[in-house]
């Protein structure tokens, strides 16, 4: 086959695997707040394994640690700061509505 008629092929590039967020020396524990807070969203939800890039065992341990910290009041169950902030309300018009 001629080079011009060959089907397009992607060049094989080596990719660099990202390092896991939990090192071998890190202990997954409910008291380790700096580690636990990496795996919680701004709303206070536990992030998924795909987002965290954790193994199944690590994700299970993180989930248990977060739940223990919530029960012991180290972590809030919800983080709804936006709910209590007051925003400027839009003034309502009291006139009759017109249809076009």
From Swiss-Prot:
Coarse class of the protein's main subcellular location: plastid
Q: Which GO terms describe its cellular component?
A: chloroplast; mitochondrial small ribosomal subunit
What keywords appear on the UniProt entry? Chloroplast, Plastid, Ribonucleoprotein, Ribosomal protein, RNA-binding, rRNA-binding
Region entry Disordered, spans: 1-23
Example GO BP: translation
Pfam families, per the entry? Ribosomal_S18
For bias type Basic residues, the affected ranges are: 1-19
One GO term in the molecular function aspect is:
small ribosomal subunit rRNA binding
| Record localization | Plastid, Chloroplast
Coiled coil found in the keyword field: no
- State the NCBIfam families in the record: S18 (TIGR00165)
* Summary of subunit composition and partner proteins: Part of the 30S ribosomal subunit.
* Listed name of the protein: Small ribosomal subunit protein bS18c
Species whose genome carries this gene = Calycanthus floridus var. glaucus (Eastern sweetshrub)
What is this protein's gene name? rps18
């Amino acid at each position: 086959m001629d080079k011009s008629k060959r089907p397009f092929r992607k060049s094989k590039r080596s990719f660099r695997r990202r390092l896991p967020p939990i090192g071998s020396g890190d202990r997954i524990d409910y008291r380790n707040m700096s580690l636990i807070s990496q795996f919680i969203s701004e709303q206070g939800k536990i992030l998924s394994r795909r987002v965290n890039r954790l193994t199944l065992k690590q994700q299970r341990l993180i989930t248990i640690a977060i739940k223990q910290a919530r029960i012991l009041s180290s972590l809030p169950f919800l983080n709804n700061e936006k709910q209590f902030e007051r925003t400027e309300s839009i003034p309502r018009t009291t006139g009759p509505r017109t249809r076009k």
